[in-house]
Amino acid sequence: MAKKTKRALAIREKLEAGKVYTALEALQLLKEMPAAKFVESVDVAINLGVDPRKSDQVVRGAAVLPHGTGKTVRVAVFAQNDNADAAKAAGADIVGMEELADEIKAGRSDFDVVIAEPAAMRVVGQLGQILGPRGLMPNPKVGTVTADIKAAVENAKAGQVRFRADKSGIVHAMIGKIDFDAEKLLENLHALIAEINKLRPTTIKGVYMQKAYISTTMGPGIAVDVASLTNA
């Protein structure tokens, strides 16, 4: 407990109370903070001016980060024939149809992303109660139900992050690991923000991106100037 307290105090000393940092300043500051005993993820939380209870204000999508997430992603694909071959060639870890569905029903869970060709949804649809709670149910809005299986697998392997505003209108996403250069983390952040901006609902009034915070897995959230989130 003493070590945790010492680290927490050291982190607190580096933060200026009430200060709002630029995105790059926040990322550089995170890298200067005392390290945890593992390579922490760098995460962003963005408060959006949306009401997710309204169907036309649901913000959900995916972004391919130029420098990846630093995480090895295992991809399962539901496809047949040419699409199954394309999935394997693109690096999918698991490819199948009914037999894969049976394995998942029996408890198989060694995958991080599930992708399906449209025709496979008749099979995948049976897995809603298993994949849904884990956030793994394929969905065309995030590119995981698609005819272009090759691109979907390549994107997932390259470090695509999926996001959705929660019931409070907050988007949480990982933009890399703390051992990334600050500039690479910033470029990943810009890619994420660009996708979130594309999904701005036409029905909302007022400010879309209201507040933003950047943090590591075990660190505090650092308030970030929303204007610094884009590379415009």
Curated annotation (Swiss-Prot):
Organism superkingdom: Bacteria
Cited PROSITE patterns: RIBOSOMAL_L1
UniProt xrefs under InterPro entries: Ribosom_uL1_bac-type (IPR005878), Ribosomal_uL1 (IPR002143), Ribosomal_uL1-like (IPR023674), Ribosomal_uL1/biogenesis (IPR028364), Ribosomal_uL1_3-a/b-sand (IPR016095), Ribosomal_uL1_CS (IPR023673)
Gene3D superfamilies assigned to the protein according to its UniProt record, in alphabetical order: 3.30.190.20, 3.40.50.790
Pfam families for the chain: Ribosomal_L1 (PF00687)
GO cellular component: cytosolic large ribosomal subunit
GO molecular function ontology, one term from the record: tRNA binding
CDD domains: Ribosomal_L1
GO BP, sorted A to Z: regulation of translation; translation
Keywords: Repressor, Ribonucleoprotein, Ribosomal protein, RNA-binding, rRNA-binding, Translation regulation, tRNA-binding
Role description: Binds directly to 23S rRNA. The L1 stalk is quite mobile in the ribosome, and is involved in E site tRNA release.
Family of the protein in this entry: Belongs to the universal ribosomal protein uL1 family.
Subunit (UniProt): Part of the 50S ribosomal subunit.
Protein name in UniProt: Large ribosomal subunit protein uL1
Taxonomic source organism: Dichelobacter nodosus (strain VCS1703A)
